[in-house]
């Protein structure tokens, strides 16, 4: 019986709450406080909403909130679409001319995400209501009835108070009546608003659900202790007892009703952007479901049932989580005056401050609740030890308290982590979006930086831009430590750095939790051990800076490691982008060597980091032992205190508790350092200079002019940078303007100047418009004043042909057909299996060079732009097609009234209809005017052939018109067509969907990794080390127990058995608090204690050393596995067939080499370590528990089964989500790469916002599996923690039920080891699941181990080794050759036979799809012969080594490729030639002249009016892809490279297409002279370049149609070759040249 005569203000006495506590505190103060707070909240909500609805216009806010009053409801509908108040026309825009043309306003109109049409987010049909079903309505009615009953009950009790007895007589019922009146009013409003159509409730009530729930919860909590008092008989009168019991159950029901109902008043509105994708149920889940993560259970069930998930099975994100809404909200926040000067990282932290504060609230509750179970555990053991002095009721209270506190910790921890993951998803979206947006805004060249900035910004690779048509542009910074912002490093920013930053922010709350835990632990230590605790604190303070220094070293190594990773990714990306060139020249081994050198540096830094990490690990392991030993030594030896057993074990337990926060802060500091490095990298990139396009271009008021007024332009601020000087050009509006000039004179740079991509030094550039493309949507189909651009090297999207032409413009069948006709694409659509629905692959890989150029031209022509800039679009097509395009496209009806500026070398073709000509020479305007004026001055051709060609064009124009119906007609004659490029499927699909394995990661994956890791012997050895560590920890614990038994036999075993288990597992929940000092020990016991401390410390040191060795060994073997896996992967990919690269996007390949390799490098080894240790720990713990308390073993089996079931469900789902997460990253990489390469074209079209929007969409596609992966992770963790709480509860119940048969020592060990086992099992499940998910990276890499390889010898049975000098003559024999791309596909080369004699020059011609390129690829064995053979000097190429074959012949490809490095490294990668030989080769291809080589450098630089020729310096840097040289210069460098090799067989594939005619003539002369000892095969569209060859091979439909001397073919007017020459408009000139060559050959033969 509780003594009631207590102090009037005492709340608790002995084992129960006092009467004062029940009556005054819980039943008077609590309701009064609730009434006050509820009234204030309701009034605040009412007035806020009243003013909000009166002042604010009722406009919808579709991006983040939806007005429920705008919904049309029908009682019969279960789910209805959203109808908004006012439908905004989001697709319409004001006329661009009416908008602000200020540069900053223009900038925002192009790039601001706030201006992006949110698309489906603004579509009201995408929103759906979840209506309350009858059960939910019934629950609201039940709530109303109970609240009404409560109101009536308390009114009655208030009236009858004088007649009541006991506690009720002292109640103040007025606060109760007022409180229940408020709650009754709220319940009434909820009933009135059941169908969501009560405007008053919706507008003015605020969140009445939250107010009601908070009140019900607090009232329920206030009645728990009185209910307990009634149960245990401490409430004297019957009426009061029944009141407490009834209030407990009634308020529990009320709380449960709202706890299980959807959160909030309003019916949930779900966003469903796709009809085949279910919306996220998160908005309408109940609070209980939310806390328990049960709302994701249907998703888990689906994954378990199907054993697989597809992307369409994923739920949508919440509306607020979609990246476009996140970005709009973030940018709005960042544009606040107080935030504009903040750095990016600070802005992110402040933006998410509200979510962080929610986390901190949960963290604070969790951090303090962590200590409750251990305190109650000690109390419980004290009761068991002294049963006669304690209360059984209080013991049961302790057991329930342990369960409740663990339950609270579980809820708080997982809400923390869930909020952190939401921050992570949103932050990753922001970072990637900002990086992408910055990439669109950046200048394409580096700019000068202030002296205090070390980072240089190199050029991105832009395949479609030839920025400098002369010898120099931007240097690539040679400093390896500088920040290189090229393609590879930018991809690394978004794939690695964005992840590291966002991942850290998901766990920032750990810093606060650790601080609280450390503070509480240290305070308790001081209370237990006194001033000696400061010794431990001092050691902790000393160790922290030492560890911080080590962390700084780790940070430095991490920065170096990331720099190496960047370099490796750059080299890999460059290699895969140029894989055809690498294979042509058999450079796979050379490039692999260069990549592996960087990889070895990367792994060396990783190993160094692991070594430092091992030192840190030793510090972590030894710290608790060091602190304990020093503290006890100080207490015994300095303070001369007698260290009692209770004090010793309490201190030991608290020191053990310190290990967890110390470990956590160590991990978090490591993550913080890595994230800070990543954030700095992102910050540096975001600070790079942006395009000045909108500042330096002036918009013409009439929207017509394109002009330069005394303009000087340069590419960058380097003194040697190429400069356009004194440009004063007024292009003719609505006419054809032609720019001509020699290769490298600056033609492309003029177009870049008009597009604002060059740096304006002086003058004024006038353009018709700078409005973004989306602002013209309302004018679709009408020619406007915008600009369209067709680059010299076609830039195409990895999409269908049609989508590339449309470029997101509205489809107009008539206009589309006209454009296809004008660009001569009809016949090409017949070639392609799916016509214009054919996927063209990455960089248009399925198309020939001419097809790519025509698709790019069609895109510009189809656009509504009134001004077209065409950069040498005729160079890549044959003469027939060039004439067609010129007549039907450039001069055709679709160009009527549009301004066209055409850069070209084909003067003879383009002068006929040109209205204005600009001739460029060395960056200056040499002459401008009409073609007749320039012709009169002799500037359009100095030789007679050029003049004759222009005259012959005029003379033959009539015949051309007559034959246009025959050869240029819109309907070509039916012909058999072959595929002359990469084949596609019948449905036109080239790019295969990325494969996704199903089910568990297979055993073969683990076996393969173990093989790479070191084999089974290594695994056994590692397991032995883990076992040794665990044995040492157990030995340390048992040493404490044995010493305690020996030295303090007068102290009960419960005081020494219990803490011993704290050293089995580093757990934060094993503290035993003791407030009583044990019996005094004599001073001579101190010697025994000192001996104990020495042995204890020695065991701890041994355990720490072995633990560090374990970490190092695991890291060492992990690095070994990484090295072997990367080496194998690189080798397989580099030697894969070309078809693999055609059908696999580079972004997908790079995903393997970036994110997957990173997982293998840095995530799998720690996972292996954790899984091994946890598994051994669980096994050892089971043995110990079974040994001490055998009755626990069946319970442990049930627990294992429970964990296994939960873990199996989790693993099935998380594995599939991890795979989907990996797959959905690849499109982001691919889209990123495409955008970076095509940024000039995108900006020229003003289409930035569309690409930003597409990037946001792809981020969302990746965020779905990533977010739900971590929600499922929370689902697992909550259930495991709940099982753990139930284990503690059941253990306590078991002890109390058997209290007479168990002592305190056994009870303590049983309970503590049960906790230990639960946490060890939890960690095992988590880490194994994590390992399984990370092994998905190994699985994806192993998938590439099976890609088809190029055979070294196609026919091993007949393998031969040719002599060293082979080939010595250069004879090529093709016998009955037939080729097909795959066994199920038709032949592309059909029974072809021809022979090329040694030293012959043979030109290969034919229409697109004739098979020209296929023949070339067959010579390099890209395709193996299906039938027939190709012999080179009598040796069948199928029988010789592939490397030997490719090194014996040389090709100069149509798309020349250079590699990052120097001119020397590109011309002579193996250092085989002298400087003199290299300069001679450069001179022969006209890249340098004799005069330049003889002139001194000072003389060249002194002439500031001329651009410096960078080819005079062989160490001049070449940017990635050679992007700092023009297309023509790159072709000439490739030719120079071939001149150095001087092979017996050389193949030229349109090698001079981008070179001016004069240079072409010189190059052809060089080819004839320099390759007079070589056999030359040339594919050419310029017939003049091959008409004097020895023979012409005419192909059509995969067959040889003609093969003879060109003059012989021209004598036959019905020949295909004659028709081609006639179509070119240069028939007379070609006949004359062929005749001269024929006569020369006859004379040469007669002399022989």
Curated annotation (Swiss-Prot):
It comes from the Eukaryota. GO terms for biological process: response to metal ion; xenobiotic detoxification by transmembrane export across the plasma membrane. InterPro entries: AAA+_ATPase, ABC1_TM_dom, ABC1_TM_sf, ABC_transporter-like_ATP-bd, ABC_transporter-like_CS, ABC_transporter_C-like, P-loop_NTPase. The chain crosses the membrane at residues 28-48, 140-160, 175-195, 207-227, 250-270, 352-372, 392-412, 501-521, 523-543, 612-632, 643-662, 1012-1032, 1089-1109, 1168-1188, 1191-1211, 1282-1302, 1305-1325. The keyword Repressor does not apply. Belongs to the ABC transporter superfamily. ABCC family. Conjugate transporter (TC 3.A.1.208) subfamily. This is Pleiotropic ABC efflux transporter of multiple drugs YBT1. It comes from Candida glabrata (strain ATCC 2001 / BCRC 20586 / JCM 3761 / NBRC 0622 / NRRL Y-65 / CBS 138) (Yeast).
């Amino acid at each position: 019986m509780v003594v009631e005569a207590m102090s009037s203000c005492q709340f608790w006495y002995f084992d129960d709450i006092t009467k004062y506590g029940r009556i005054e505190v819980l039943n008077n103060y609590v309701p009064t406080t609730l009434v006050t707070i509820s009234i204030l909240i309701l009034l605040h909500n009412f007035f806020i909403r009243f003013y909000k609805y009166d002042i604010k216009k009722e406009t919808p806010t579709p991006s983040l909130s939806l007005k429920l009053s705008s919904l049309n409801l029908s009682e019969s509908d279960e789910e209805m679409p959203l109808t908004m108040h006012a439908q905004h026309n989001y697709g319409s825009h004001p006329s661009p001319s009416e908008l602000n043309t200020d540069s900053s306003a223009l900038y925002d109109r192009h790039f601001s995400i706030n201006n992006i049409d949110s698309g489906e987010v603004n579509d009201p049909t995408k929103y759906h209501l979840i209506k309350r079903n009858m059960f939910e309505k019934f629950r609201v009615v039940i709530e109303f009835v109970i609240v009404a009953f409560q109101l009536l009950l308390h009114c009655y009790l208030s009236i009858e108070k004088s007649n009541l007895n006991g506690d009720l007589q002292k109640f103040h019922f007025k606060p109760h009546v007022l409180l229940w009146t408020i709650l009754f009013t709220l319940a009434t409003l909820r009933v009135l608003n059941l169908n969501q159509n009560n405007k008053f409730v919706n507008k003015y009530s605020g969140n009445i659900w939250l107010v009601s729930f908070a009140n019900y919860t607090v009232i329920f909590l206030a009645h728990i202790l009185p209910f307990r008092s009634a149960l245990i008989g401490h409430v004297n009168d019957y009426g009061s007892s029944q009141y407490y019991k009834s209030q407990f159950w009634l308020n529990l029901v009320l709380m449960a009703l709202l706890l299980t109902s959807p959160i909030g008043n309003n019916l949930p509105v779900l966003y469903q952007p796709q009809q085949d994708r279910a919306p996220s149920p998160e908005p309408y889940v109940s609070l209980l479901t939310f806390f328990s993560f049960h709302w994701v259970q249907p998703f888990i069930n689906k994954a378990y049932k199907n054993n697989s998930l597809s992307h369409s099975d994923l739920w949508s994100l919440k509306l607020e989580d979609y990246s476009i809404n996140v970005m709009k909200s973030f940018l709005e926040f960042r544009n606040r005056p107080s935030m504009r000067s903040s750095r990016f990282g600070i802005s992110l932290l402040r933006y998410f401050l509200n979510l962080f504060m929610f986390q901190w609230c949960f963290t604070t509750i969790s951090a303090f609740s962590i200590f409750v179970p251990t305190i109650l555990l000690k109390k419980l053991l004290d009761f068991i030890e002294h049963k006669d002095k304690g209360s059984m009721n209080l013991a049961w209270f302790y057991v329930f308290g342990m369960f409740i506190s663990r339950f609270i910790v579980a809820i708080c921890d997982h809400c923390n982590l869930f909020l952190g993951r939401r921050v992570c998803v949103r932050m990753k979206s922001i970072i990637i979006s900002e990086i992408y947006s910055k990439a669109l805004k950046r200048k394409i060249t580096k700019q000068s930086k202030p002296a205090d900035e070390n980072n240089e910004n190199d050029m991105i690779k832009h395949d479609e831009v030839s920025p400098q048509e002369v010898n120099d542009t931007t240097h690539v910074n040679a400093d390896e430590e500088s920040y290189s912002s090229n393609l590879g490093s930018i991809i690394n920013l978004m794939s690695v750095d964005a992840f590291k930053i966002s991942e850290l922010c998901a766990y920032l709350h750990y810093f606060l939790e650790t601080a609280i835990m450390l503070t509480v632990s240290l305070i308790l230590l001081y209370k237990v051990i006194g001033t000696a605790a400061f010794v431990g604190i001092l050691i902790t303070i000393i160790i922290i800076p030492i560890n911080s220094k080590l962390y700084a070293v780790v940070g430095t190594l991490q920065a170096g490691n990331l720099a190496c990773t960047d370099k490796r990714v750059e080299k890999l990306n460059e290699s895969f982008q140029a894989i055809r060139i690498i294979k042509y020249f058999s450079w796979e081994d050379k490039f692999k060597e260069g990549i592996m050198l960087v990889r070895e540096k990367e792994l060396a830094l990783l190993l160094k980091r692991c070594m430092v990490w091992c030192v840190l690990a030793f510090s972590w392991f030894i710290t608790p032992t060091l602190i304990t030993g020093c503290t006890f030594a100080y207490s015994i030896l300095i303070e001369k205190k007698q260290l009692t057993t209770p004090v010793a074990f309490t201190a030991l337990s608290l020191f053990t508790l310190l290990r967890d926060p110390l470990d956590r802060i160590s991990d978090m500091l490591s993550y913080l350092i890595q994230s800070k490095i990543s954030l700095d990298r992102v910050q540096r990139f975001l600070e790079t200079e942006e395009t000045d396009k909108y500042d330096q271009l002036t918009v013409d008021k009439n929207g017509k002019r394109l002009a330069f007024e005394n303009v000087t332009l340069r590419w960058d601020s380097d003194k040697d940078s190429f400069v356009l000087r004194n440009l004063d050009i007024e292009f003719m509006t609505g006419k054809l303007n032609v720019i001509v000039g020699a290769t490298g004179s600056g033609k492309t740079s003029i177009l870049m100047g008009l597009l604002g991509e060059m740096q304006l030094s002086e003058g004024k550039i006038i353009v018709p418009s700078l409005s973004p493309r989306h602002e013209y949507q309302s004018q679709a189909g009408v020619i406007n004043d915008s600009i369209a651009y067709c680059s010299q090297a076609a830039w195409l999207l990895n999409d269908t042909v049609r989508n590339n032409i449309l470029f997101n413009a509205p489809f107009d069948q008539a206009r589309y057909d006209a454009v296809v006709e004008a660009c001569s694409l009809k016949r090409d659509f017949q070639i392609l299996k799916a016509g214009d629905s054919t996927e063209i692959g990455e960089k248009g890989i399925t198309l020939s060079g001419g097809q790519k150029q025509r698709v790019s031209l069609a895109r510009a022509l189809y656009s509504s732009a009134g001004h077209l800039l065409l950069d040498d679009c005729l160079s890549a097509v044959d003469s027939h097609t060039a004439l067609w395009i010129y007549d039907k496209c450039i001069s055709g009806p679709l160009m009527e009234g549009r301004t066209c500026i055409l850069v070209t070398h084909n003067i003879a073709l383009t002068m006929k209809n040109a209205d204005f000509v600009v001739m460029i020479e060395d960056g200056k305007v040499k002459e401008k005017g009409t073609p007749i004026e320039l012709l009169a001055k002799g500037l359009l051709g100095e030789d007679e052939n050029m003049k004759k060609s222009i005259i012959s064009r005029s003379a033959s124009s009539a015949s051309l018109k007559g034959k246009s119906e025959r050869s240029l007609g819109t309907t070509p004659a039916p012909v058999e067509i072959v595929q002359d490029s990469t084949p596609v499927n019948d449905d036109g699909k080239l790019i295969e969907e990325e494969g996704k394995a199903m089910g568990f990661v297979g055993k073969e994956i683990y076996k393969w990794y173990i093989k790479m890791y070191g084999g089974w012997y290594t695994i056994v050895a590692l397991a032995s080390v883990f076992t040794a560590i665990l044995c040492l920890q157990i030995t340390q614990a048992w040493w404490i127990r044995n010493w305690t038994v020996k030295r303090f036999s007068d102290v009960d075993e419960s005081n020494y058995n219990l803490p011993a288990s704290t050293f089995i597992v580093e757990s934060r929940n094993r503290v035993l608090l003791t407030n009583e000092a044990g019996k005094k020990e004599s001073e001579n016991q101190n010697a025994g204690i000192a001996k104990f401390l020495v042995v204890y410390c020695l065991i701890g040191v041994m355990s720490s050393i072995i633990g560090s060795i374990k970490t190092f060994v695991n890291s060492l073997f992990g690095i070994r596995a990484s090295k072997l896996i990367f080496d194998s992967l690189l080798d397989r990919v580099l030697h894969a067939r070309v078809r693999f690269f055609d059908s696999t996007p580079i972004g997908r390949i790079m995903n393997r080499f970036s994110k997957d390799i990173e997982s293998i490098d840095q995530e799998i080894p720690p996972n292996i370590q954790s899984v091994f240790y946890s598994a051994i720990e669980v096994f050892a713990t089971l043995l110990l528990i079974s040994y001490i308390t055998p009755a626990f073993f069946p319970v442990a089996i049930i627990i294992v089964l429970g964990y296994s079931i939960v873990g199996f469900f989790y693993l099935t789902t998380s594995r599939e989500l991890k795979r989907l997460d990996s797959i959905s990253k690849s499109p982001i990489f691919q889209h990123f790469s495409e955008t970076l390469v095509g940024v000039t074209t995108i900006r020229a079209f003003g289409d930035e916002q569309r690409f930003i929007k597409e990037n946001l969409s792809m981020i969302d596609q990746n965020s779905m599996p990533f977010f739900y992966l971590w929600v499922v992770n929370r689902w697992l963790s909550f259930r495991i923690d709940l099982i753990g709480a139930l284990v503690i509860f059941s253990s306590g119940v078991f002890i109390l039920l058997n209290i007479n048969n168990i002592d305190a020592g056994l009870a303590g060990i049983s309970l503590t080891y049960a906790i230990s086992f639960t946490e060890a099992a939890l960690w095992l499940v988590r880490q194994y699941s994590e390992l399984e998910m990370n092994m998905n990276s190994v699985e994806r890499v192993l998938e590439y181990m099976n890609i088809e390889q190029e055979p070294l010898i196609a026919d091993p049975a007949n393998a031969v080794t040719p002599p060293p000098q082979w080939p010595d003559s250069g004879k090529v024999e093709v016998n009955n050759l037939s080729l097909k791309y795959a066994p199920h596909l038709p032949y592309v080369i059909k029974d072809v036979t021809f022979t090329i004699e040694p030293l012959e020059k043979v030109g290969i011609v034919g229409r697109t799809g004739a098979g020209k390129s296929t023949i070339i690829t067959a010579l390099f064995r890209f395709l193996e012969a299906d039938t027939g053979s190709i012999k080179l000097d009598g040796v069948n190429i199928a029988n010789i080594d592939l490397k030997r074959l490719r090194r014996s012949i040389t090709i100069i490809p149509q798309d020349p490729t250079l590699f990052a490095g120097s001119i020397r490294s590109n011309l002579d990668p193996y250092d085989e030639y002298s400087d003199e030989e290299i300069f001679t080769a450069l001179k022969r291809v006209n890249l340098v002249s004799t005069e330049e080589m003889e002139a001194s450098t000072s003389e060249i630089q002194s002439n500031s009016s001329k651009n410096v020729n960078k080819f005079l310096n062989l160490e001049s840097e070449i940017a990635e892809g050679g992007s700092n040289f023009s297309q023509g210069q790159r072709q000439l460098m490739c030719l120079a490279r071939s001149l150095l090799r001087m092979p017996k067989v050389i193949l030229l594939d349109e090698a001079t297409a981008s070179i001016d005619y004069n240079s072409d003539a010189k190059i052809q002369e060089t080819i004839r002279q320099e390759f007079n000892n070589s056999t030359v095969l040339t594919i050419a569209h310029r017939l003049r370049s091959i008409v004097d060859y020895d023979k012409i091979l005419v192909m059509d439909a995969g067959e040889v149609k003609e093969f003879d001397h060109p003059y012989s073919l021209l004598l036959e007017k019905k020949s295909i070759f004659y028709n081609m020459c006639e179509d070119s408009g240069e028939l007379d000139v070609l006949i004359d040249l062929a005749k001269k060559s024929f006569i020369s050959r006859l004379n040469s033969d007669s002399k022989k």
